[in-house]
Amino acid sequence: AAVGVDIGCGMNALRTSLTAADLPDKLAELRSAIEAAVPHGRTTGRGRRDAGAWENPPANVDAHWSTLHAEFQWLTSKYPRFLNTNNYKHLGTLGTGNHFIEICLDEAQQVWVMLHSGSRGIGNAIGTYFIEMAQKDMEQNIANLTSRDLAYFSEGSEHFVDYVLAVSWAQDYARANREAMLENVLLALRKTIDKPFTLVSEAINCHHNYVQKEQHFGKEIYVTRKGAVSARRGQYGIIPGSMGAKSFIVLGLGNPESFCSCSHGAGRVMSRTKAKKLFSVEDQIRATAHVECRKDANVIDEIPMAYKDIDAVMAAQSDLVEIVHTLRQVVCVKG
């Protein structure tokens, strides 16, 4: 249950050969092209078809789904409830909340594509179901836990084995989801910008909400990173700020006391409900004046002031990571 329901949520970032001067004067055109290329948001209600799902998934989504389908068949043969989810048609889509796609500039004015998303509807369904199952399995001992949400499976039990397989599949789905989105954002860039460009660096694709087996202090253990990124020595990671603040490409320093981990971002200083009560559309417009993005009432909960100061966060973890690039967004797409 410590992983929660947004299994495999994480970041993807890629540097291009484009510079700020290559971007169109009217960035709204670029934002519209990205919004057309990647389904985002959702339709009110719980229908299987929503605004955030594909009606007819493109070929690259089919290709990614083919790598996931065999294990999904095993999962649904034992747990057929997962057939009744947006699985295939959510692959390569953004979602809502704090998930985003951004076009950023680094300190050398080079253009980066950066995005944040996870395992979408199917990951939520897997997480919710197995959390409820763990709570039922622990019914007699649940009172001994500080929170029902920390219910767990005993290693070696049937449900433990099934959960490990299911969560691993959802993490693979999340990684493929980000890869498919990145491909389609790059297509949107090529359609919008006349100048040919190349990809300068290999994409960084990192989870910040996941579990995996690792070696620490001479033992093989399961490490859960909830809002944390793996930061082994020399390992690249991505630490985003809010939609109006800086983000960072980092190299891990391999600090053993943190289990080779670092924070995944700024983190909120207030709830979404409080942000909506405290701030107005005018506040959002002022805070994101330098960004081509939505500035309506439905994204006030994502206003930069609802998040911690990212510079303070980075200073607090200077023994965990080294900053390689500092990015500032010029286009931001939210669901």
Regions found by a protein language model. Give the residues of each.
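Active-site cofactor/substrate anionic-group-binding motifs, chiefly glycine-
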Residues: 1-8, 12
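Acidic, low-complexity central loop/insert segments
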Residues: 16-19
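Active-site-proximal segment of RNA-dependent polymerases
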Residues: 48-54
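Short, polar/flexible loop-turn hinges at active-site or ligand-entry regions and domain interfaces
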Residues: 21-23
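Mid-sequence, gly/pro-rich, charge-dense loop/helix-turn segments that line enzyme active sites
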Residues: 40-48
